[in-house]
């Protein structure tokens, strides 16, 4: 419950008190009795209803006249006595710093009362001060912050606080000020004693006495006390250099005095509050013993009232650093402790003597002393430039209040010479500090000696006369003052030009800055001061509106030079900041915290795109551990999700060739190609099953990876369309200039290749040698730096070789990989013909694309060396696969026997079989059981999936061939076999490579297909064209001998035996293969294979090259198919043996056909049996021209 108001205490505690004692009429007493009853009735009401009534009552405001409902008689009855009269009362706003309080003031002839108006129309006394302890002043800006109307305000204070009292009108303000000053002086005349001893302590001042006791009068101000104490302490200087502080027991910390306070009243008030004086003397003027003031020394230190003299520069620093001093009696919130800003003032570099000049001092010094060669100090110029730049865009500039502590801290920094970054300060703080600087110029910037002349300017006739008068007065000012005025009015003019947005017209600016520009030389009456203030405001308004005519047009360009310097400095700081971030681009924190719209994004364009540090901006960190290990290269199609599929086809070609020319590592062993992760591929060839893998293409790229050969023009083009996403993309997705040159050189080769193929289709001429020769020349010129990579496939790359893919692919994706035109594509399905024409017509029809993949894998191997090793290790055989190898060995031996039988009969593989097999090199390598030169089924560098067990088994199986040039010695470790095979293949000469094709083996096969193909009748025409595009070497005819001459006769015999073989194979039920990765059954594919087996046997089909399906996770494949291989092997073996037995009787009559048929059939059967889980199976028939088809 609230404490009782004074009138309630009086009336309630003394109900029989006579009204005559209060000095109030009985009528008033009756009214007070009614008031008492009303108050008591309110207290008896319930709390909710009372609160509701209070909420609905109108809150009093300063501008309102005293409410008639507020009855002051009861309140005054406790204050008025026989010798005390009420002079005036009214409402006013008391402001201290940023705090504003509405109070009701009562002025008696000897007492000043401040009361708070309560909502129940009662008063609560907040302060009761003797007039002899009070003071008044006009320094409104020193006490209050913000927009204070000096016309209606003045400073009012008592020990030891200062307030800005604002009244409803200037008349009210003048009336209150005159009454206060008059009765304060009257009460001071009654003081006794008129003077008291005052002890002054010197602090932070060297070479002076510690303390001195001086005698002060009751009318001496703080500045006058400073002037008296300086010589007694042995200090030279003026009161502006020092400040007087008060340390009393009532305050937690010393309080600085502005200069207009009365130390006499402060000490006497403290004595009365300390109960040193008699109780009767507190409210009276009874004299007391002169020795009693000296009893202050006997009090505890915390109760003593001490006056401390400090340098003025230290005074502000002490106030900032001392957290114990609470200006507004408010504690700092512990919640915001992280945002507390401590003072950065350095107090250790102070001069030892106060008389020596203080370096860096700025405030309170005349302009000629701080301006060297009439140039403004840098802090002042920086503030003016900042205000000129930000002020026109700030609403209420120079008018809105600023934080007092921030202003004092900035002022101290500027005054101490510390470099200050104004960008970190509020614009209002800077404006307030600038006004403070102008206010501290001795004699004002317009010179107080010319005050009367300045005020009389506005009395001139017209504007011309006023301007001439102003210019004559400016000539009388020091040059430094004129320079500052030119800059100052340039800023004010610029702000005034934008008054529509900042609401600061010339009049508003003049009202705010006039008190800081000109003031009278001596104090005068309030009436005169108000009149002079109005005239000065009108003068400043006139100067702002006519500054261009007074100071010249050039004041608008004064800040251009400063602006250029500042812009240069800002750019330098931005560049240093950007380089600092770049120097630590290996940090994951910088990568994670990087925003696409960061400030450095604009700076990137300024710096140009040639910087190597751009790679840290354009790559992703590999911190993302939850992403799959499938990696690849980014293409623009990954960014532009809105473009059509046709656009996607057109965009893929220029991007896919980027790594071919820029990502070359010459000293990496060739066998390392096989270590590439099986899922690495360009997104252009990713199938639907690998769509998710493509999305994480460059996700694991290290941010510290150097950028390699990217072009500024390409980077700028990409940034224009993919501004945000490109920052996280890899520069590998950019087409380099080398690719463009490569395409230009390739165009004539393409035309020549097409012409040759057309001729071959008409005449049947073998053009493979010419194509291989041209192809070899081109590869040597374009990729000679790759060393063994170039020598590996000279003259022997058939047309069907394309960029290897390491992810499961559909038939549609497989068809996209063909590097030749659709007219020469022997197995391109019709539904992909249109897609092939666009991106592939510009490539030479006989050009192998395996070299591109070699370079890509070489590049990827350099980046993912650790992950390749991990992938290779993960590609180890499971226990089931080891058993599978044992079964495979036995099948190899049996297959070899069948081959030997065919060799005994003298049947050689003809030219057609070699031609047919060479065209199948587009498919991934798989296990092959081939006659004679089966060594060529080894997985080619850069195309064999790392850790592929079946691909390695192909190498192991090929060692059994009698005529193989390269024979691995181990089959226990498929991975080792693959590497050994590749090491051997590096050393093969072109002749051996060509010989492998003629003898029926497809050279370095490219692991391309990812689905089990089946035969389609409608692709026979395409196969015919591809048959003639096979690369052959003349030396192969020498090795084959007579068998090569009999090759054409075998075709007719094979046709005759074809119907009979179909009947033999038809009863065989289709073997049920394991489910394919694509989820489509392969029964149809196997049925077609079995159906076509006799046909191929009759026609002398060459050994089939099968491809191992590439899988991104080898363990999944092995686990998925481990249960099916054995049953499938046995079924196919039985089929093979039965076919062999039916064909064998006819071998005696035919010199080569039946053994050849037997060899072919056995080769096909064992091949399928040994690799039941392999993805695609390609069976090529020259005569029937069957094409493999994905299921």
From Swiss-Prot:
GO terms for biological process: regulation of Rho protein signal transduction; regulation of small GTPase mediated signal transduction; signal transduction. The modification Phosphoserine is found at residues 46, 704, 730. Residues 934-961 have a biased composition (Low complexity). The record marks 399 as: Arginine finger. CDD domains: PH_RARhoGAP, RA_RHG20, RhoGAP_ARHGAP20. One of its GO terms (molecular function) is GTPase activator activity. The lineage of its organism: Eukaryota, Metazoa, Chordata, Craniata, Vertebrata. Expressed predominantly in the brain. Lower expression is found in lymph nodes. Residues 194-295 form the Ras-associating domain. InterPro entries: ARHGAP20-like_RhoGAP, ARHGAP20_PH, ARHGAP20_RA, PH-like_dom_sf, PH_domain, RA_dom, Rho_GTPase_activation_prot, RhoGAP_dom. This is Rho GTPase-activating protein 20. Keywords: Chromosomal rearrangement, GTPase activation, Phosphoprotein, Tumor suppressor. Residues 365-551 form the Rho-GAP domain. It is linked to A chromosomal aberration involving ARHGAP20 may be a cause of B-cell chronic lymphocytic leukemia (B-CLL). Translocation t(X;11)(q21;q23) with BRWD3 does not result in fusion transcripts but disrupts both genes. It comes from the Eukaryota. Residues 78-180 form the PH domain. Residues 1-23, 962-981, 1103-1116 have a biased composition (Polar residues). PROSITE patterns: RA, RHOGAP. Residues 1182-1191 have a biased composition (Basic and acidic residues). SUPFAM superfamilies: GTPase activation domain, GAP, PH domain-like, Ubiquitin-like.
């Amino acid at each position: 419950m609230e404490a009782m108001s004074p009138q309630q205490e009086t009336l309630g505690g003394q109900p029989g008190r006579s009204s005559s004692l209060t000095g109030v009429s009985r009528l008033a007493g009756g009214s007070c009795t009614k008031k008492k009853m009303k108050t008591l009735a309110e207290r008896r009401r319930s709390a909710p209803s009372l609160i509701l009534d209070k909420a609905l009552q109108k809150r009093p405001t300063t501008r309102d006249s005293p409410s008639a409902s507020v009855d002051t008689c009861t309140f005054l009855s406790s204050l008025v006595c026989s010798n005390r009269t009420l002079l005036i009362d009214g409402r006013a706003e008391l402001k201290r710093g940023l705090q504003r309080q509405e109070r009701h003031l009562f002025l008696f002839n000897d007492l000043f009362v401040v009361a708070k108006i309560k909502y129940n129309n009662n008063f609560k006394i907040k302060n009761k001060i003797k007039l002899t302890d009070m003071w008044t002043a006009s320094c409104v800006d020193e006490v209050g912050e913000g927009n204070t109307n000096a016309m209606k305000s003045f400073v009012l204070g008592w020990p030891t606080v200062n307030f800005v009292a604002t009244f409803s009108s200037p008349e009210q303000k003048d009336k209150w000020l005159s009454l206060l000053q008059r009765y304060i002086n009257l009460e001071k005349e009654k003081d006794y004693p008129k003077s008291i001893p005052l002890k002054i302590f010197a602090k932070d001042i060297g070479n002076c006495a510690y303390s001195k006791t001086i005698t002060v009068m009751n009318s001496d101000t703080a500045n006058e006390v400073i002037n008296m104490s300086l010589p007694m302490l042995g200090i030279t200087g003026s009161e502006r250099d020092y400040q007087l502080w008060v340390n009393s027991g009532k305050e937690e910390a010393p309080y600085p005095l502005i200069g207009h306070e009365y130390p006499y009243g402060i000490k006497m008030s403290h004595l009365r509050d300390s109960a040193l004086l008699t109780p009767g003397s507190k409210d009276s003027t009874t004299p007391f013993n002169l020795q009693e003031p000296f009893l202050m020394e006997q009090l505890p230190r915390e109760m003593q009232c001490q006056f401390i003299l400090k340098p003025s520069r230290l005074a502000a620093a002490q106030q900032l650093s001392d957290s114990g001093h609470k200006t507004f009696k408010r504690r700092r919130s512990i919640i915001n402790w992280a945002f507390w800003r401590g003072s950065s003032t350095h107090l250790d570099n102070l001069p030892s003597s106060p008389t020596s000049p203080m370096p860096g001092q700025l405030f309170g010094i005349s302009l000629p002393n701080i301006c060297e060669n009439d140039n403004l100090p840098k802090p002042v110029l920086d503030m003016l430039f900042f205000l000129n730049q930000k002020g026109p865009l700030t609403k209420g500039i120079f008018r809105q209040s600023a934080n007092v502590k921030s202003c004092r801290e900035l002022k101290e920094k500027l005054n101490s010479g510390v470099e200050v970054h104004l960008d970190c300060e509020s614009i209002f703080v800077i404006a307030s500090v600038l006004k403070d600087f102008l206010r501290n110029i001795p004699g004002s910037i317009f010179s107080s000696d010319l005050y009367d002349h300045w005020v009389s300017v506005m009395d001139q006739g017209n504007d011309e006369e006023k301007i001439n008068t102003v210019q004559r007065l400016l000539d009388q000012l020091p040059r430094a003052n004129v320079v500052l005025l030119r800059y100052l009015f340039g800023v004010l003019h610029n702000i005034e030009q934008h008054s529509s947005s900042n609401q600061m017209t010339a009049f508003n600016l003049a009202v705010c800055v006039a008190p800081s520009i000109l003031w009278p030389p001596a104090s005068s009456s309030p009436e005169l001061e108000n009149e002079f203030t109005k005239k000065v405001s009108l003068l400043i308004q006139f100067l702002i509106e006519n500054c261009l005519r007074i100071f010249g047009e050039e004041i608008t360009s004064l800040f251009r030079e400063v602006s250029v310097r500042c812009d240069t400095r800002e750019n330098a700081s931005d560049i240093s900041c950007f380089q600092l971030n770049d120097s630590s681009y290996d940090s994951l924190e910088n990568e994670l915290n990087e925003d696409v719209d960061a400030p450095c994004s604009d700076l990137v364009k300024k710096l140009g795109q040639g910087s190597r540090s751009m790679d840290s901006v354009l790559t992703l960190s590999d911190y993302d551990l939850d992403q799959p290990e499938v990696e690849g290269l980014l293409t623009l199609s990954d960014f532009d999700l809105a473009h059509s599929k046709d656009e996607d086809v057109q965009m893929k070609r220029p991007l896919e060739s980027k790594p071919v020319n820029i990502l070359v590592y010459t000293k990496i062993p060739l066998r390392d190609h096989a270590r590439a992760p099986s899922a690495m591929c360009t997104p252009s060839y990713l199938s639907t099953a690998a769509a998710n893998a493509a999305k994480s293409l460059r996700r694991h790229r290290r941010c510290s990876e150097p950028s390699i050969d990217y072009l500024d023009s390409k980077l700028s083009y990409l940034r224009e369309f993919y501004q945000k996403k490109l920052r996280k993309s890899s520069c590998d997705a950019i087409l380099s200039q080398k690719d463009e040159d490569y395409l230009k050189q390739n165009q004539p080769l393409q035309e020549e290749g097409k012409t040759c193929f057309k001729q071959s289709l008409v005449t049947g001429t073998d053009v493979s040698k010419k194509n291989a020769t041209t192809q070899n020349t081109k590869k040597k010129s374009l990729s000679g730096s790759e060393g063994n990579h170039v020598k590996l496939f000279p003259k022997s790359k058939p047309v069907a070789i394309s960029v290897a893919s390491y992810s499961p692919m559909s038939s549609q994706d497989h068809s996209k990989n063909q590097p030749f035109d659709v007219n020469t594509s022997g197995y391109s399905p019709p539904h992909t013909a249109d897609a092939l024409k666009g991106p592939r017509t510009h490539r030479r029809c006989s050009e192998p694309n395996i070299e591109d993949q070699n370079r890509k894998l070489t590049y990827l191997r350099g980046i993912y060396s650790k992950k390749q090793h991990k992938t290779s290790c993960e590609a180890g055989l499971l226990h089931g696969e080891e058993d599978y190898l044992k079964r495979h060995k036995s099948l190899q031996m049996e297959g070899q026997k069948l081959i030997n039988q065919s060799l005994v009969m003298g049947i050689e593989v003809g030219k057609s079989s070699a031609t047919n097999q060479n065209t199948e090199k587009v498919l991934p390598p798989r296990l092959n059981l081939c006659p004679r030169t089966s060594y060529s089924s080894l997985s080619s560098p850069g195309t064999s999936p790392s850790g592929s067990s079946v691909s390695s088994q192909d190498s192991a199986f090929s060692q059994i061939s009698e005529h193989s040039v390269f024979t691995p010695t181990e089959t226990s470790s498929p991975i080792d076999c693959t590497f050994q095979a590749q090491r051997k293949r590096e050393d093969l000469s072109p002749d051996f490579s060509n010989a492998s094709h003629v003898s029926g083996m497809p050279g370095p096969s490219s692991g391309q297909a990812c689905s089990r193909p089946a035969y389609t009748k409608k692709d026979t025409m395409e196969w015919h064209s591809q048959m003639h595009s096979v690369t052959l070497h003349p030396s192969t005819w020498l090795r084959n001998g007579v068998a090569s001459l009999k090759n054409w006769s075998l075709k007719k015999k094979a046709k005759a035996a074809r119907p009979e073989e179909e009947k033999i194979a038809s009863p065989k039920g289709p073997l049920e293969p394991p489910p394919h990765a694509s989820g489509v059954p392969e029964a149809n594919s196997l049925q077609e294979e079995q159906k076509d087996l006799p046909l191929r046997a009759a026609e002398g089909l060459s050994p089939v090259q099968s491809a191992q399906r590439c899988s991104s996770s080898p363990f999944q494949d092995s686990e998925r198919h481990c249960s099916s291989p054995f049953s499938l092997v046995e079924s196919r073996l039985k089929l093979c043996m039965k076919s062999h037995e039916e064909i064998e009787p006819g071998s005696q009559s035919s010199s080569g056909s039946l053994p050849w048929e037997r060899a072919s059939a056995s080769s096909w059967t064992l091949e399928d049996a040994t690799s039941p889980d392999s993805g695609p199976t390609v069976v090529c028939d020259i005569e029937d021209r069957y094409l493999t088809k994905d299921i």
